[in-house]
């Protein structure tokens, strides 16, 4: 939560998102005996994960580190709490790990800037602006960060916010050039 904009943090962005399946997991899924065990484990893990998340939210709320909005699905976190949390993560060498999760979750949730996606984009745009100010260090995170900024720039351009669109698109292009190389952009 400490990386998002301090207001309107959607619950969906905070939950764990399953990683892509490996080839072994895909093969295991085809095995009917494995499937039965996996279904039972998945249901148990999902329930445990939901309970843990709810417990964590209650603890944070009880200590006034966060507040739950009236809709029950979005949160707020004071800037000083965000800053203190990021400092703690840095001291404990976890800052990049959590920044990567933040970028990954936000990139997965942020749609294209097409008109039909504007409501979702509008809700997530402040968080994309926050992400723009928090460039990750790891290359795998930078790819997602550049993609997020591209989608956010697209939305900003569509709604007529040229200044934000230009800034985000330039960050995205520069990052992609650094990762992919200038030849990629020259079409060669």
PLM features: residue spans?
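C-terminal boundary/linker of central alpha/beta nucleotide-binding cores
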Residues: 1-91, 96-104
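Extended alpha-helical scaffolding segments used for macromolecular assembly and cargo binding
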Residues: 2, 99-171, 175
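Short, conserved phosphate/pyrophosphate- and ester-handling motifs at nucleotide-, phospho-/glycolipid
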Residues: 78, 181-184
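Hydrophobic alpha-helical membrane context
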Residues: 90, 173-174, 182-183
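Residue register of alpha-helical TPR repeats
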Residues: 147, 186-188
